[in-house]
A protein has these predicted regions:
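Short, charged helix-capping/linker segments at alpha-helix termini
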Residues: 25, 78, 139-142
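N-terminal intrinsically disordered/low-complexity leader segments
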Residues: 1-6
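Hydrophobic/aromatic-rich alpha-helical bundle segments in the mid-to-C-terminal region
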Residues: 106, 117-130, 138-179
Length: 181
């Protein structure tokens, strides 16, 4: 990030990166402002609701960003099967390039807060619903869209735990086969 990037955006970006890698509970406010190179007071100036408001903004901004990214990858391919493979291949490449640290930021937060913070759980659920809707528009089958999203998110979790992209590739092949039926 550039030194001229506004403070709010630096804080949002730093929080998104840290939440994606460490989870919500594993990330402290001091760490966020240090990473953002921002004064501590600026966090509460821009996010008066504190860490929860910051996380909700990260969820919504991250959800929109990743939906745009995935749909761009998907739409660049000639057919649904190739599109699905490209999404899963890109996810595997990202995991490898980041030493399995970068996965889906929404899933990372959802897994962390689903049973302890209903406000953030609802925000993550809304993003997953938006993603399912976007994929349904491309596949014309909401069950297939949901199954593919579930396979992708589950593969992220298993890949990180096992430190291999094999689950992502296997899930991608299964998802691609689903759309060719």
């Amino acid at each position: 990030m550039s030194a001229i990037t506004p403070t709010r955006e630096r804080i949002l970006y730093a929080a998104a990166e840290l939440f994606r890698r460490q989870g919500y509970a594993g990330t402290g406010l001091n760490q966020i402002v240090a990473e953002a190179q921002a004064p501590f007071g600026s966090l509460y100036h821009h996010f008066p609701g504190g860490k929860q408001q910051l996380a909700e903004d990260v969820i919504r901004a991250g959800g929109a960003f990743f939906q745009h990214l995935v749909t761009a990858i998907y739409d660049a391919e000639p057919n649904a099967e190739a599109s699905i493979r490209a999404v899963f291949t890109t996810a595997a490449e990202t995991l490898t390039a980041t030493d399995f640290q970068d996965a889906c930021p929404i899933a990372t937060i959802a897994l962390d807060v689903a049973s302890t913070n209903d406000h953030l759980r609802r925000a993550t659920a809304e993003v997953f619903e938006e993603w399912t809707t976007a994929l349904t528009e491309r596949l014309d089958d909401s069950d297939h869209a949901l199954a593919i999203l579930a396979a992708l998110e589950g593969a992220f979790v298993i890949c990180r735990a096992q430190r291999t992209t094999r689950p992502m590739h296997a899930a991608g092949e299964m998802a691609a086969a689903l759309v060719t039926r």
